[in-house]
Amino acid sequence: IAHAGWYAGDMACAIGAGTWDGVYASAQAAVAAAKAVVEGAEEAMALCRPPGHHAYQDRSSGFCFLNNAAIAAGVLRSRFKRVAILDFDTHHGDGTQAIFYRRSDVFYGSVHTDPRNYYPYYAGYADETGFGEGDKFNLNLPLAPGTGDEPFIDANQKLIVAALAAEAEAIVISAGWDAHFDDPLSKLAVTSDAYRRLGRIYGEVPLPTVIVQEGGYSLAAIEEVAPRFVSEFLDERQPS
């Protein structure tokens, strides 16, 4: 048990008889979506569960065992010189940031609740911009508790601008639905309509895209926001 604890960042990743099967299937969904884009699809979505963005290379945490978005980005790198991971889960993706913090081939940008009094607490601050070769390839835009639709959407637009400025050739969207005001873990005040608008905004980005599902803990909210996001995203991607 002590050895297992060395590779666990918190108490949120219990391991049972079926854990590995679920974790592996979730990661393989991300692999399949990324392979579809590598082979020529303009977009693909991985309905991952459990989520992944709190998982480090060698550590589970925050309900996450394998980092699905990072795995997808690795697959995309077989075709694209630089990939951007853009994360709008209400929690900062500390695992994703750590994996790519010293690298310039994957840009990571995150919009999330200010971590000063919110999980993951020790990462997600605006002054974390990357290190060494990865300097300026990490962007954190923390939002104060109670933040609503307009600042949330504006911050996502800033992520997109930064990813394009970094010359990303493909995008992984870490799509967390838990910023919704009805989510039991949310401290933000984001509405269902904001996710609809986000779908349109991300759909306008002229890059091959993999959507990887992250968090979301209100089934009622997910039933509203995920279809709205995906529908608007796909509508924008249709040839005019």
Regions found by a protein language model. Give the residues of each.
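Metal-dependent catalytic neighborhoods of phosphoester/phosphodiester hydrolases
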Residues: D183-S186, L219-E224
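Catalytic cores of large soluble enzymes that bind and process phosphate-bearing ligands
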Residues: G18, G22, A144, S218
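Conserved alpha-helical scaffold segments that buttress catalytic/binding sites
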Residues: V31, K35, A46-I201, V230-L234
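A short helix->loop->beta-strand "cap" motif at the edges of active sites that frequently abuts
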Residues: E204-T209
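A contiguous, low-structure linker/loop signature
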Residues: I1-Q28, G40-E42
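C-terminal helix-to-coil terminal segments
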Residues: A221-S240
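Alpha-helix N-cap/loop-to-helix initiation residues
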Residues: D149, S218-L219
